[in-house]
Amino acid sequence: MPKLTQADLIDLNQTFEERTPQELLTWSKKVFADKVAAISAMQEAGSVVCHMISTLKLGIRVLFVDTGVMFQETLDTRDRLMREYGLDIVTLHPKQTMEDQTQQHGILYLTVEGQQQCCHMRKVEPLNEVAGQYHAFIGSLRRGEGGKRSFCPVLQVDTENSTVRINPLAMMSDDQMDAYVREHNVIVNPLHAQGFATISCNRCTTPVLPNEPKRAGRWRHLGPWSVYCGINPADREAGAKQVIELPQDVIDRILGREADFVI
């Protein structure tokens, strides 16, 4: 099957630096049609993407991975987005319940290595299970989050599941996102107002103090060695070969070889 490399996307990523999130979302729908889905953990940035998809009437499906140990506020946010924004949100689940996993493997999230295994089983694998239905996933990473995400591109090949990851909010600053949320009264997970800078499983997520890094509340019990869950390609160590396989017509549309798909 034809291959798409990260190097193939260099020129397009430079062009996309000048595009708005709305333009990038519209491009995503035109290029990938029903083979693109947004992924959201029901955090603030994900809600912004969901609001844009709804406002633009793009009909893009949203995938939410319910690890089985999510905060109730997160599940309530998902339900509100479905109800009030009219979104098609599909909830994905791990193969095992947390109870069954613990019985088989022990409490994985108590060690760095175990945390990586736990996140892979409960977050990454459910997404990989459906990845064959899609050519691209829309995320909500922003360079303003810092860390490894400081340099996240708009388009990135995801070798984990052979899809293109699209980050339409990559250039959006904290102030710009706050302004968008206020202006459009975006539905936001209420945990953010309780001091949670980032939100995931209730076992491994805590609020942060004003002077702490945004991700200090994730796996706090493991210190600075655990920061990311691994579901986003920008958070993983880039392999020697950043290449994925896609149908040739899809690659042609991505790279603008058909005039209708150039923006």
Can you say where each PLM-predicted feature lies in the sequence?
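Nucleotide-activated chemistry modules centered on ATP-dependent adenylation/adenylyltransferase
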Residues: M1-I263
